[in-house]
Amino acid sequence: MLLIDIKDKELSQEEVEILEHPLVSGLILFSRNFHDKVQLEALVKSIRQRVKKPLLITVDQEGGRVQRFREGFTKLPAMQAFHTLAKNPQESTALARQTGWLMAAEMFALDIDLSFAPVLDLGHQCKAIGDRSFGENPDAMLPIAEAFIDGMREMGMATTGKHFPGHGHVLADSHLETPFDDRPKEAIFNRDILPFKQLISKGKLSAIMPAHVIYTQCDSQPASGSEYWLKQVLRNQLNFNGVIFSDDLGMKGAGFMGNFVERSEKAIHAGCDLLLLCNEPEGVIQVLDGLKYQPTKTQTERHISLMKRKTVRWNELEASPRYQQAQQRLTALQNDWLEYKAQHC
């Protein structure tokens, strides 16, 4: 039910006990948990061995500026680089697929189940999204996003489309405050929601993460706590049958929904299967003590479906020609993107 974080680069006994709580289903790793590849491998091994139940181990390893593990890992390009720098659509989709495959392979080689990717927000004006987006035009960005997803799926990693129904149009950063999107309902349904709709119809999204954004012309609650968005639209209209993650309930944007227990209750009632709660250790304890909820059989099955099902050895991955070629190409692309941004921003 709950995905939480840990404080440092080693697992404490107190954290082991918290992770073994019946309501905890997994954890998310951050840059503070990472020093180098050897340390990360030891940390994940410690988690797997010391916690006496299967845990979903996750990370945000999107690429560009949102890449928690860097030293010893491929410098993944920002998603906007594919459309902007590729010579033609065929090259952009090929690069995107390579990136999805390589990212998933590197995570599996460290025994990490899932990277929360890809971002499907249209790149309007939100600084929190920015070059994390594949582009502004849904028709142009969809093939690139789909190619990235196909690369992840080829490796066997579950995919997470975020931030439903679209975070890209608001100026406010939901890490810091609750954003409000005042556009008419038609504007959201005719543009922002299209990448989610198309990829759901093709069965290519294992999970969805809704936004901590209030779409004022549609509902009074943030999408992450909205029955309208999660049950009526996502489940009933779009027929999505996968996992619904809440975005981090520790973010300021979730504060609109009350204290940590109230946020969790509202997210569950709205339709979330798994809840992220990060950087709030006291909040985690409050939820574990105060949340009265037993996950359903369907929610448990959805959770298990996200677990890694393929073993990848790092030395074998590094030795493969496909990996070597992809790493060289994608590192060069990210360097080109940084140079491009320096000249145009």
UniProtKB/Swiss-Prot annotation:
Positions of the catalytic residues: H175, D247
InterPro entries: Beta_hexosaminidase_bac (IPR022956), Glyco_hydro_3_AS (IPR019800), Glyco_hydro_3_N (IPR001764), Glyco_hydro_3_N_sf (IPR036962), Glycoside_hydrolase_SF (IPR017853), NagZ_Beta-hexosaminidase (IPR050226)
One GO term describing the cellular component: cytoplasm
Alphabetical GO biological process terms: carbohydrate metabolic process; cell division; cell wall organization; peptidoglycan biosynthetic process; peptidoglycan turnover; regulation of cell shape
Catalytic activity from the UniProt record: Hydrolysis of terminal non-reducing N-acetyl-D-hexosamine residues in N-acetyl-beta-D-hexosaminides
Location(s), subcellular: Cytoplasm
The keyword Transcription regulation belongs to this UniProt entry's keyword annotation: no
Pathway: Cell wall biogenesis; peptidoglycan recycling
Residues the record marks as site: Important for catalytic activity: D173
Function description: Plays a role in peptidoglycan recycling by cleaving the terminal beta-1,4-linked N-acetylglucosamine (GlcNAc) from peptide-linked peptidoglycan fragments, giving rise to free GlcNAc, anhydro-N-acetylmuramic acid and anhydro-N-acetylmuramic acid-linked peptides.
The protein's name in its UniProt record: Beta-hexosaminidase
Annotated source species: Actinobacillus pleuropneumoniae serotype 5b (strain L20)
